[in-house]
């Protein structure tokens, strides 16, 4: 909390949805607004802004086990997924089958469904599992063998935090003339990812969760070096041109991954996200991952002793190697418990988790600012709400964001 904005008497367990505000980001944004934009105006493109994405890509590469020229920062995860899937379909590198599974984040499914219709491909195949806890890898592999092509999976499942075996699935996909597009959104900044060692060919993710980049922070894409020139972005924007400031016609894509740029970079958002990445590098991703394993194990032990007798079920893998950095609880009253935690009681502590349908309470652990004491107090607060039946006083009305 030395490095982040902290609200007194509040325990924040939602870093898996939106990370905290780094104090340095506040200073960086203020300086950018007052000086770079306010005083320097257009001159700041040359003085500060044009090289900003590359600087961030150099830093992200250290966290993701990639080369900087294999990464591109910008746009949103949804837009980037559209560009990547479209480029793969157009390349004919693999058969034009689109496959995902029922654990994937819905926006990925929506994008793939839309592309299948737009490009008149075979309908999207969704591998459905019997539970939300983990993937049935046998079922998934059978579908890949049957319908090889472009597979999109989330490295960490957004509901249960199940962590997919990245390298072995990449190897299996390659053996079956397929490419897996990995969504790293719930993993980046908290899982020790090595895109090279895991033989990953395509990946993307957001930076506003465990990387603490801020709401709407630009996302990133990764394309294995050998694939870059074989793929073409469907959005031919001027920043993807080999010489954007020549303003020449016709469009000639940049040689490297910059061909996946489109419009003008989101400068203020890029400035805001740098402090969070710097803090992750300062802490060290190996240290962050170790603490995440220890803290999720501690939380699960507390849940077993304090909440399981009250009817809660753990919907997160018990093995440290098979989970990301949030723990999911299942109970028919999870929504009202969630509201009670957020509202607090009298002058007591407020706990900020989140809720996912139909009845899941997600407790996100961001090791870079979550303490073991935070975890203990949060679980004791859930127990208090249940034992006193405090949730009976909470209505079931839900806001748009839960």
Outline where the language-model segments fall.
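Pyridoxal 5′-phosphate
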Residues: 1-402
């Amino acid at each position: 909390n030395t490095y982040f904005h902290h609200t007194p008497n509040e325990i924040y367990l939602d870093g898996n949805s939106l990370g905290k505000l780094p104090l340095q980001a506040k200073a960086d944004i203020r300086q950018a607004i007052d000086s770079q934009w306010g005083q320097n105006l257009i001159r700041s493109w040359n003085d500060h802004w044009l090289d900003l994405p590359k600087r961030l890509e150099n830093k992200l590469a250290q966290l993701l086990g990639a080369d900087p020229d294999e990464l591109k920062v910008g746009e949103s995860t949804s837009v980037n997924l559209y560009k990547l899937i479209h480029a793969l379909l157009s390349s004919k590198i693999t058969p034009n089958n689109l496959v995902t599974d029922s654990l994937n984040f819905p926006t990925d499914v929506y994008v793939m469904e839309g592309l299948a219709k737009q490009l008149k491909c075979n309908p999207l195949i969704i591998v459905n599992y019997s539970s939300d806890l983990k993937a049935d890898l046998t079922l998934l592999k059978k579908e890949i063998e049957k319908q090889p092509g472009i597979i999109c999976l989330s490295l960490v499942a957004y509901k249960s935090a199940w962590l997919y075996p990245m390298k072995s699935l990449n190897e299996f996909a390659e053996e079956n003339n397929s490419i897996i597009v990995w969504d790293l959104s719930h993993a980046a900044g908290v899982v020790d990812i090595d895109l090279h060692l895991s033989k990953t060919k395509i990946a993307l993710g957001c930076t506003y969760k465990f990387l603490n980049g801020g709401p709407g922070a630009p996302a990133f894409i990764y394309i294995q070096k050998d694939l870059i020139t074989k793929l073409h972005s469907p959005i031919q924007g001027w920043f993807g041109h080999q010489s954007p400031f020549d303003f020449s016609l016709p469009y000639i894509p940049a040689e490297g991954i910059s061909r996946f740029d489109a419009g003008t970079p989101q400068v203020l958002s890029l400035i805001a996200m740098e402090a969070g990445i710097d803090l992750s590098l300062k802490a060290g991703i190996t240290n962050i991952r170790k603490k995440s394993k220890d803290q999720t194990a501690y939380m699960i032990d507390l849940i077993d002793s304090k909440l399981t007798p009250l009817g809660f079920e753990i919907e997160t893998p018990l093995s440290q190697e098979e989970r990301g950095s949030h723990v999911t609880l299942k109970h028919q009253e999870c929504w009202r418990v969630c509201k009670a935690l957020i509202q607090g009681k009298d002058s007591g502590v407020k706990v900020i988790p989140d809720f996912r349908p139909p009845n899941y309470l997600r407790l996100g652990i961001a090791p870079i600012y979550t303490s073991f004491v935070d975890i203990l107090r949060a679980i004791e607060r859930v127990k208090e709400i249940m034992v006193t039946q405090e949730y009976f006083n909470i209505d079931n009305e839900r806001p748009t964001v839960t």
